[in-house]
From Swiss-Prot:
Source superkingdom: Bacteria
Record's keyword annotation contains Transcription regulation: no
Subunit structure: Homodimer. Part of the ribosomal stalk of the 50S ribosomal subunit. Forms a multimeric L10(L12)X complex, where L10 forms an elongated spine to which 2 to 4 L12 dimers bind in a sequential fashion. Binds GTP-bound translation factors.
UniProtKB keywords: Ribonucleoprotein, Ribosomal protein
BP GO terms, sorted: translation
NCBIfam families, per the entry: L12 (TIGR00855)
Keyword Acetylation: no
Name of this protein: Large ribosomal subunit protein bL12
Record's GO cellular component terms: cytosolic large ribosomal subunit
């Protein structure tokens, strides 16, 4: 299979399929797709005391009422039932990335009200 064929196959995948692919690659090769902490720390130090304006809403766990959390995830993301369930089952997982502070806090409140454990990054 050529590099171009692999890229074409990846283009046709859904977000959840890509997430599964990344996890499989991480397990197979013993690597991680996470950015090194030193790079993130350096970027934060350069920014000084500037307030963060964009946040990532990360679902840490669904808690006891998984069904309610799935409903809220569907409402927030617009995903289908299967995709929302896979996202909740795959926690910790980002729900939305690069959202304004106010919107991120609203999402966090909705998810926590449904019983989820959520972190803003």
């Amino acid at each position: 299979m050529s590099k171009d064929q692999i890229i074409e196959a990846i283009k046709e995948m859904t977000v959840l399929e890509l997430n599964d692919l990344v996890k499989a690659i991480e397990e197979e090769f013993g690597v991680t797709a996470a950015a090194p902490v030193a790079v993130a720390g350096g970027a934060a130090a350069e920014g000084g005391a500037a307030e963060k304006t964009e946040f990532d809403v990360v679902l840490e766990s669904a808690g006891g009422s998984k069904i309610n959390v799935i409903k809220v995830v569907r409402e927030i993301t617009g995903l289908g039932l299967k995709e929302a369930k896979a996202l909740v089952d795959g926690a910790p997982a980002p729900i939305k990335e690069g959202v304004a502070k106010e919107e991120a806090e609203e999402m966090k409140a909705k998810l926590e009200e449904a019983g989820a454990s959520v972190e803003l990054k």
